[in-house]
Amino acid sequence: MARVKRGVQANRRHKKILKRAKGYYGARSRVYRVAVQAVTKAGQYAYRDRRNKKRTFRRLWIARINAGARLNGLSYSRFINGLKKANIEIDRRVLADIAMHDAAAFTALTEKAKAALA
């Protein structure tokens, strides 16, 4: 049987890893062995942070809604409770956007929430 040389596959694999490590500092972008570790770790961070991003954005939306609600004399929890009682189903992302960009509409929502709480 003929001897199998794996140079082509090795070069391809190395090139693929070094391409993904492009822009990394120092040896991380040049030395294959170090680049493999850097790329693997980057993948772990990316996986973790794709999940954390959802939490982070939810926290941001809640902070924005709370700020808007307090300007209209309600706390966040009472505002959300009022919306639920008034059967207004708007998600937090949209509520935060309304609070930031359309103060009049948000004030109208807070008035409806207050009415439902009374």
Curated annotation (Swiss-Prot):
Among the GO biological process terms of this entry, one is: translation
Q: Which domain of life is it from?
A: Bacteria
Keyword vocabulary terms for this entry: Ribonucleoprotein, Ribosomal protein, RNA-binding, rRNA-binding
Q: Tell me one GO molecular function of this protein.
A: structural constituent of ribosome
Annotated Gene Ontology cellular component terms: ribonucleoprotein complex; ribosome
Instruction: Give one Pfam hit by family name.
Output: Ribosomal_L20
What's its job?
Binds directly to 23S ribosomal RNA and is necessary for the in vitro assembly process of the 50S ribosomal subunit. It is not involved in the protein synthesizing functions of that subunit.
Q: Which family does it belong to?
A: Belongs to the bacterial ribosomal protein bL20 family.
The protein in question is named Large ribosomal subunit protein bL20
Gene encoding the protein: rplT
